[in-house]
């Protein structure tokens, strides 16, 4: 349920399975439904295939072999890794003539009295308010076992995000989710200081829209 209070009155629905989607409109008591008009200026029909059992939200096993299920590294990397893992979400959004997949991270700030859902992603994913408004995020979209891939319970948030900033040079973008983060999500800490050469680094992401994965390497100074 969402109040359409935006100036443009637009609302992007969550992605749903099947060929039909039902939309219910709730009006205040005493308000006639006669003048209400609904338009669908854009539709995104996500194609599925037999490999994914014709389910649009799977994409299981689509990533490269250097990525392992995020749950596999919990014992090795500990609590800090688990917190960072729980801050990462799968993304779908509409841009130009298609729907795309990316990864984003929920960020913390220094105000301990609030939990503002700052959301960091890539500039090449979202670089305008028009695209940010179409954002859906998928939380805890990961395997419940190390092997085989087994999609557990996840939460989908719709309603989009407010676009705050992006930079093509750094390929970064900052958004603010219009819905609060779901239960179980974490707010990731961050540090703007440069990494030392050969520092171990870990990428927690949804490559090719796959389940949450982690890959590892070392920081290399560009020359």
Q: Where in the sequence are the language-model features?
A:
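Short, surface-exposed tryptophan/glycine-enriched loops
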Residues: 2-20
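Serine endopeptidase catalytic core focused on the charge-relay Asp
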Residues: 15-223
């Amino acid at each position: 349920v969402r109040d359409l209070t935006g100036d443009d009155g637009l609302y992007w629905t969550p992605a749903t399975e099947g060929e039909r989607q039902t939309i219910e409109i709730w009006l205040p008591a005493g308000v006639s439904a006669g003048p209400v008009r609904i338009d669908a200026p854009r539709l995104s029909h996500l194609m599925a295939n037999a490999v994914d059992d014709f389910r649009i939200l799977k994409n299981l096993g689509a990533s490269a072999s250097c990525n392992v299920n995020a749950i596999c590294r919990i014992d090795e990397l500990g609590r800090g890794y688990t917190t960072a893992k729980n801050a990462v979400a799968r993304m779908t959004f509409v841009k130009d003539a298609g729907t795309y997949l990316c990864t984003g991270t929920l960020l913390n700030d220094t105000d301990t009295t609030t939990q503002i859902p700052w959301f960091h992603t890539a500039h090449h994913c979202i670089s305008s308010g028009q695209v940010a408004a179409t954002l859906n995020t998928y939380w805890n979209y990961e395997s419940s076992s190390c092997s085989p891939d087994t999609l557990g319970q996840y939460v989908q948030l719709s309603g989009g995000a407010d676009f705050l900033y992006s930079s093509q040079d750094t390929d970064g973008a900052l958004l603010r989710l219009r819905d609060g983060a779901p239960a179980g999500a974490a707010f990731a800490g961050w540090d703007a200081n440069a990494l030392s050469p050969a520092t171990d680094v870990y990428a927690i992401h949804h490559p090719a829209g796959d389940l949450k994965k982690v890959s590892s390497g070392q920081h290399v100074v560009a020359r």
